[in-house]
Design a protein with these regions (language model features):
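Iron-associated oxidoreductase/ferritin-like identity signal
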Residues: 1-151
Length: 151
């Protein structure tokens, strides 16, 4: 796999992960304003974590001799309903992991990038499982009980 393809994939991650971090921070503040303190804290931490990955991916682009771009981001939706948000975030994780699996396969000959992406993949997979678990919990205990747990 050429450095150009790896750099392009890392740049895609930088742009989209920065967007996700912004989205998670905004959702955190929306949830805090509504009194959903546990969700607010979770997504604030998640935004910080994602920014850390953005920094690592930027550094790797530079290590590979690439040029980092500050690309336009598409507009994202802000959710008022926490359950709608969890469903949306879960789908983003599912779709992202499918794409990331292909990127991992492409990066297998660049062990440093591969290892970085593998750590990120595991983290995103954990987030996906959390979202799925929350939706299962809502089915078991009901919406109101789940919402009460988020306060």
């Amino acid at each position: 796999m050429s450095n150009e393809k790896i750099i392009a994939d890392l740049q895609f991650l930088v742009t989209n992960l920065a967007q996700q971090a912004d989205g998670h921070l905004i959702q955190s503040r929306v949830f805090a304003a509504k009194g959903f303190n546990k969700l607010a804290e979770k997504y604030a931490e998640h935004a910080t974590e994602e920014r850390g990955y953005v920094e690592k991916f930027i550094d790797r682009i530079l290590d590979l001799g690439g040029k980092v771009k500050l690309e336009n981001k598409k507009e994202g939706e802000v959710f008022e309903n926490p359950i709608d948000w969890v469903k949306h975030d879960l789908q983003v994780s599912v779709d992202g992991l499918t794409w990331l699996k292909k990127v991992l396969d492409n990066a297998k000959d660049d062990l440093t990038t591969y290892d970085m992406l593998k750590v990120y993949y595991k983290d995103e997979e954990s987030d996906m499982y959390w979202g799925d678990q929350q939706l299962e919990m809502i089915e078991c205990i009901g919406v109101q009980n789940w919402i009460a747990q988020q306060i």
